[in-house]
Amino acid sequence: MKVNPSVKPICDKCRVIRRHGRVMVICSDPRHKQRQG
């Protein structure tokens, strides 16, 4: 899980979602998981 000021989709399977007011990227590749913070 990377914590970045700006989250961007890396590949085609990356999805940008909002959970509890946080912007997150979920993907089938676990290395692409990101959270804004």
Curated annotation (Swiss-Prot):
Gene Ontology MF terms: structural constituent of ribosome
- What biological-process terms (Gene Ontology) are attached? translation
Give a GO cellular-component term: cytoplasm
Q: Which Pfam families match?
A: Ribosomal_L36
> Which residues does UniProt assign to the signal peptide?
none
Q: Which UniProt keywords apply?
A: Ribonucleoprotein, Ribosomal protein
Q: Which HAMAP family match?
A: Ribosomal_bL36 (MF_00251)
Question: What protein family is recorded?
Answer: Belongs to the bacterial ribosomal protein bL36 family.
NCBIfam families associated with the record: rpmJ_bact
PANTHER family, A to Z: 50S RIBOSOMAL PROTEIN L36, CHLOROPLASTIC, LARGE RIBOSOMAL SUBUNIT PROTEIN BL36C
What protein name is recorded for this chain?
Large ribosomal subunit protein bL36
Gene that codes for this? rpmJ
